[in-house]
Structure formats: structure tokens, C-alpha cells
């Protein structure tokens, strides 16, 4: 599926280099209980849980910059430097570049959507654009589901804003429900978001 700037394609092993570029960064992955991936093999193993052979019910997409997008569109708006200050930003923000991932990493007991983007893309609106496109795809591909959920650390304002912009509503705040050993405090609070199918109906 294409948007004005993005191309969402099914995540495959071919996307491992871009996936590893994101998951090898401790700062980008600091909100994940999994933590960063130290080696390419670590990223390969972590990504395998999103692929159809292991996760047949998952709906998981690589988010790429459209190959036909003029690089000047990005450069003119944000300058030649990387917005996130990462040295790999120039390589990522090129036509066809792997920007991030969005998908349902698990479906039981209910489908849960997650997303993560290379830090050079932060602040450019790609996450919101990708999640909106993903929702359109998900509701078509999984008519049996009435809703999607997402869990976000209470201090992760950027991700919370993305989910809210895309129609997710806060259900509850769960106090001290998980741990991030590299954060202060280690015991974390999480926000439980939910989005309903737009037409409010499910398959019969």
C-alpha cells in the first residue's frame, strides 16, 4: 500500500538490515522490554517472531520511503542533516529506505499493534502516516477483529500522540505493570489504548 510518501510492504527476511539498524540502537529501543539487539543474529531471531512462518495471524509491514519520491521533498522540508542526529540518517531517508515497522506482533488474546522507526525519521510524521495506512490494511485483512489495542509507556509521549492521532482512545493506566532495567524508575506505568473498527461490525 502506498501513501503520499510511504510504501508499506509485508515484512520479510530481506528487510533484516534495516530492521537491525533500528533495533541495534539502545536509545531507539529503550521503551521495549526486549531491549536492543547486540548482533545481526539477535535481530534476525527477534524479527522471526513477526514473519508468517512463526506468526501466521500477524499483519506486519515494513515501512519504506517511496522509491519514486523526490529526495528533495525531504531535504527541502528538513534540511540535509538527519533530524534525529543519527549518522545513518542520510542513508535511511533515501527513496526505498527502510524507515520502520508497524504491525500486530501478537493476536492472542487480542490483536496488539506495535511500531518502531529509525530515529533519523522522528518528527517527520512518518509514524502517523504509516499507522493510518496500516489500520486501513488491517481492518480489510482481518475482518474477524472488532478492535486493536496498543500499550505505551506513560512517559513515551511521542508514541502516545501517534496513537491518539490515529483514533486510539485511552482505556486505562496500569501502574507498575512492567520493568525496564535501564530506565529510572525501573518499575514502569503503561497506557492501554484501544481502536475500534470504523464501521463497528465484524465478520459473521
Model region roles, listed by residue range:
Residues 38, 48-62, 70:
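A short helix-loop-beta-strand connector motif used in the catalytic cores of GNAT acetyltransferases and
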Residues 47-51, 178-181:
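Short, P/G- and charge-enriched loop/turn segments at secondary-structure junctions
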Residues 20, 34-35, 55:
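Short, surface-exposed helix-loop/turn micro-motifs enriched in polar/charged residues
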Residues 27-49:
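Conserved GNAT-fold acetyl-CoA-binding loop/helix
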Residues 1-29, 60-204:
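Acyl-donor (CoA/ACP) binding surface of acyl/acetyltransferases
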Amino acid at each position: 500500500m502506498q501513501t503520499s510518501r510511504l510504501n508499506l510492504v509485508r515484512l520479510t527476511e530481506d528487510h533484516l538490515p534495516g530492521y537491525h539498524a533500528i533495533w541495534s540502537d539502545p536509545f531507539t529501543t529503550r521503551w521495549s522490554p526486549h531491549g536492543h539487539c547486540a548482533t545481526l543474529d539477535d535481530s534476525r531471531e527477534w524479527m522471526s517472531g513477526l514473519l508468517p512462518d512463526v506468526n501466521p495471524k500477524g499483519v506486519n509491514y515494513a515501512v519504506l520511503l517511496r522509491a519514486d519520491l523526490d529526495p528533495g521533498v525531504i531535504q527541502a522540508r528538513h534540511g540535509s542533516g538527519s533530524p534525529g542526529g543519527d549518522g545513518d540518517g542520510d542513508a535511511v531517508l533515501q527513496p526505498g529506505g527502510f524507515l520502520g515497522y508497524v504491525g500486530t506482533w501478537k493476536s492472542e488474546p487480542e490483536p496488539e499493534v506495535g511500531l518502531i522507526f529509525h530515529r533519523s525519521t522522528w518528527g517527520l510524521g512518518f509514524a502517523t502516516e504509516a499507522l493510518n495506512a496500516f489500520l486501513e490494511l488491517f481492518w480489510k485483512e482481518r475482518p474477524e477483529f472488532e478492535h486493536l489495542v496498543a500499550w505505551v509507556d506513560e512517559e513515551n509521549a511521542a508514541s502516545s500522540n501517534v496513537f491518539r492521532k490515529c483514533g486510539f482512545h485511552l482505556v486505562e493506566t496500569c501502574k507498575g505493570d512492567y520493568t525496564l532495567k535501564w530506565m529510572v524508575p525501573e518499575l514502569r506505568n503503561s497506557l492501554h489504548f484501544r481502536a475500534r473498527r470504523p464501521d463497528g461490525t465484524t465478520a459473521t
